[in-house]
Amino acid sequence: MEIEKTNRMNTLFEFYATLLTDKQMNYIELYYADDYSLAEIAEEFNISRQAVYDNIKRTEKVLESYEEKLHLFSNYVVRNQLLEELMKKYPSDQYLISKLQEIQQIDEEEF
């Protein structure tokens, strides 16, 4: 499994997990976050390896679809880049820096 895809799926999962069914959440979390194999997940839930694979592939598409429609992750990335740029551009403005850090903290608490 390629690391970029794993990282992306883990990140999308963080943003959209609450929109998934319990089964989708379990399979994706075990597969991507906990690095379980398809066989291990199948054994855990007493289903076929193919059923796990199919569910994971469908859930990946669902997560990508949510991001395509809602843009939570991409907006988060852009927002953080802008905050970092402002902090670098105005490092001596302590009031601005503190407010920018508050914004970052809000983002971190949400996700």
From Swiss-Prot:
InterPro entries hit by this protein: RNA_pol_sigma_r3/r4-like, UPF0122, UPF0122_fam_protein, WH-like_DNA-bd_sf
Superkingdom of source: Bacteria
Chain segments annotated as coiled-coil in the UniProt record: none
PANTHER family, A to Z: UPF0122 PROTEIN CBO2450/CLC_2298, UPF0122 PROTEIN YLXM
Functional summary from the UniProt entry: Might take part in the signal recognition particle (SRP) pathway. This is inferred from the conservation of its genetic proximity to ftsY/ffh. May be a regulatory protein.
Family according to the record: Belongs to the UPF0122 family.
HAMAP family (alphabetical): UPF0122 (MF_00245)
Name the record gives this protein: UPF0122 protein llmg_1069
Species per Swiss-Prot/TrEMBL record: Lactococcus lactis subsp. cremoris (strain MG1363)
